[in-house]
Amino acid sequence: MMLRSRHEISKLLAYNRWANARMLEPVAAVSAEEWDRDVGGSFGSLHGTLTHIYAGEWVWLERARGQSPRSLPTNEDLPTLEALRGEWRSLEEGISEFARGLSPAELARPITYTNFVGVNWTYTVADILFDLVNHSTYHRGQIATLLRQLARTPVSTDYVKFFDSGGFAQPDRTPGELARLFAYNRWANMRVLRSVSEIPAEDYGRAVGGSFSTLRDTLAHLYGADWVWLERFAGRSPRALPEGQQAGTPQVLEQKWRQVEEGWAALVGELEPERTREKLAYTNFKGDPLSYCVGEVLVHLVNNSTYHRGQVATLTRQLGRKPASTDYLMMLDEA
């Protein structure tokens, strides 16, 4: 079980609501044509991708309540941004109300639901709620890519920025919870690398637009974030991330990444509860001194990786390939 307390659920759900609101800010400026333009994403357009994020949150709330919907809301149900925002506000209130009274026993309660093709699945309430947030983060990354491809500028939804904005300030992370988060992150990153390993070099480095333009550079950024935070935990403050060309082929990048992942496994495996509540001080790329609670930095890193894996999926699909599925619940099924 990923979440063990109502406090932790409240933090993640409050972050998710904050991030969704920020995500929608630049969307308000797009034209009607851009709203529905098929740009080759997993769900075609901005409209389709936003509907999918909303629908994912809706269906997981229904399942956590013990229901088994047989279909998702569609673009026709949510034709405009105004309609989507109105329904989303009501949904977020419903999610908050559901989570507000959950006890540890209720978090651990298994829920069995029937999916859209008639197959039964069972997960705990805690894992369902974590997947709800993780799924939204993944597709917010895709929205950022689509906005840039439409010559728009997305807004940052980094987890640590949520704390800067006045979000929950009291950490409550257990070493076991963090170890499971990092096991998921490693599993997901390796699945992504395997899925792109056969992409030709010319496609791997082809500029298709997005936050980092190419698939190679997006993966290099994803790796670089893992690397730079590990450096910061070692007391160093690098002044830049590795460039895309330095990352090399997917096979070379995987070798480098496995070394970083081993470093994270050792660090997280040795965490004591009191360490998760300490501050990590470092200097960012601009030379500014910053500090955040260790536990929340680690959650930020995994959330950031999920976000950029969503971007990798969009670029992979736009290159005519099938992206890897990295849902948290899929990892549980494979365990």
Predicted regions located by residue number:
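Carboxylate-rich helix-loop segments that flank metal/cofactor sites and access channels
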Residues: 104-116, 273-285
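Short, contiguous alpha-helical
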Residues: 6, 10-25, 32-74, 116-170, ...
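Intrinsic disorder/low-complexity detector
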Residues: 173-174
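Helix-adjacent hinge/juxtasegments
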Residues: 67-107, 236-276
